[in-house]
Amino acid sequence: MSKIIGIDLGTTNSAVAVLEGTESKIIANPEGNRTTPSVVSFKNGEIIVGDAAKRQAVTNPDTVISIKSKMGTSEKVSANGKEYTPQEISAMILQYLKGYAEDYLGEKVEKAVITVPAYFNDAQRQATKDAGKIAGLEVERIVNEPTAAALAYGMDKTDKDEKILVFDLGGGTFDVSILELGDGVFDVLATAGDNKLGGDDFDQKIIDFLVAEFKKENGIDLSQDKMALQRLKDAAEKAKKDLSGVTQTQISLPFITAGSAGPLHLEMSLSRAKFDDLTRDLVERTKTPVRQALSDARLSLSEIDEVILVGGSTRIPAVVEAVKAETGKEPNKSVNPDEVVAMGAAIQGGVITGDVKDVVLLDVTPLSLGIETMGGVFTKLIDRNTTIPTSKSQVFSTAADNQPAVDIHVLQGERPMAADNKTLGRFQLTDIPAAPRGIPQIEVTFDIDKNGIVSVKAKDLGTQKEQHIVIKSNDGLSEEEIDRMMKDAEANAEADAKRKEEVDLKNEVDQAIFATEKTIKETEGKGFDTERDAAQSALDELKAAQESGNLDDMKAKLEALNEKAQALAVKMYEQAAAAQQAAQGAEGAQANDSANNDDVVDGEFTEK
């Protein structure tokens, strides 16, 4: 069975891992980094992903960041003169990760386990699966990020029982999960979180502070200047990271804008104390989900054995202190918070292929599921933190006499009224025989699969007629849209491959020209005139082809030059070998003379 890669598709950074033997290994990107910025930019018709895209974010307005925050919505982003869905942009990131994983493995990759925040709803999970499909990946499993982290943490601890709390604060989302580990079973007891809280929010606090201070001093609002704002974002992220290691950092942005008197510069120092003050409310928001998860798991703090920190934002000292204060425990630092989720996803891939044995993952649904009933009430069929996959049925009836049809309004959330929860979809069960209200028996069944994706069935128990749908959110993509996007992605991949081939050829040509010119110079006056002239002629022809830019001509002339250069190199080698042989012969003769002299015995002359 081919390898299943594990992908952590993050808001600010993503990572890919693969199982090698029994070890999960992070695959470095082409720049040698173990995580890849979740950034996509467009330039001259080319799609650029990762570090290169992030570097040009300041100067290139066609750059998309933090697309994960829009997953599961109908919101589109404009770039490159086109509109893109969040699924398409995410697919470009996935395609890039897939590409360099294939380069590392030396084989095609077609399957993946992709992680999502535990608190992602059905629409967001479906959007993630669609993004994988567009990228040419069969998504074998959608796994909650804290669960994947626990899997990586607990793989070598299957012989002992423990309860762990995973505190996962990423770039754009926050999750808390409580798991019980024992005998290879990873059982999620409860999960809670906030999909609108992450490292980006901490950056934004610094940006707002810098904008306000600059406006106070210079009367100019930098938030209205797109390029200045991007520079502020980069500076804020760097300052945040600096303050995890030092207590004060300098923010220096020369020529940030211009005033009536000329260019203006932003120079400001930011202390950790000030940063903590600016972000106090964000840190405070992490506490409620921790308490909620403990309450749902029916556990006290004393029953938690370990606290695992996941996500780059858990490096913020105030966050670490808040976790200590809230749990009464020193966090376990045995895992890398940036890499552990992708590693866990790769382990789950190994479970699916059978390479990892005796491991069972029992995940939960993060939000309650149900339907709208009379009076706009939300009636739950499946409570949050129910282990998945699961199925639950309940019988309902009509609200009016002779009602011919019932509308099934499917919802996800925790509020008592339907209007306050997230609509997953609507469908209708028709042709109900005429009967007084309350008589028809309508059985509604909810199914949640292992990926947390929902399907609903309504059945008239009198006529046995049923209606069945896999929930597609109003913001989701149709199969036709997914197919079109897959074709676009394939076309882009072909164009990218062609572009890479062109670049490789041009580099090869440059290298061949440089090497041949060097050889011709070195062999001047050494008697290889025929071979040197042939190589020079082939070199001139290749340079002319290079000037014209005709790739086929360049390829042909490169082959011709390589042939002539090889002939010249052979002559050089033969001459060098002959010279070496002659030198060895001379040494041999000298050695013989020395040996003959050794036979002469010195006599002693005595005068009489």
From Swiss-Prot:
InterPro entries: ATPase_NBD, Chaperone_DnaK, Heat_shock_70_CS, HSP70_C_sf, HSP70_peptide-bd_sf, Hsp_70_fam. Residues 599-608 have a biased composition (Acidic residues). Induction: By stress conditions e.g. heat shock. The modification Phosphothreonine is found at T173. Residues 576-608 are annotated as: Disordered. The keyword Chaperone applies. Keywords: ATP-binding, Chaperone, Nucleotide-binding, Phosphoprotein, Stress response. It holds the Pfam family HSP70. Acts as a chaperone. Belongs to the heat shock protein 70 family. HAMAP family: DnaK. This is Chaperone protein DnaK. The lineage of its organism: Bacteria, Bacillati, Bacillota, Bacilli, Lactobacillales. The gene is dnaK.
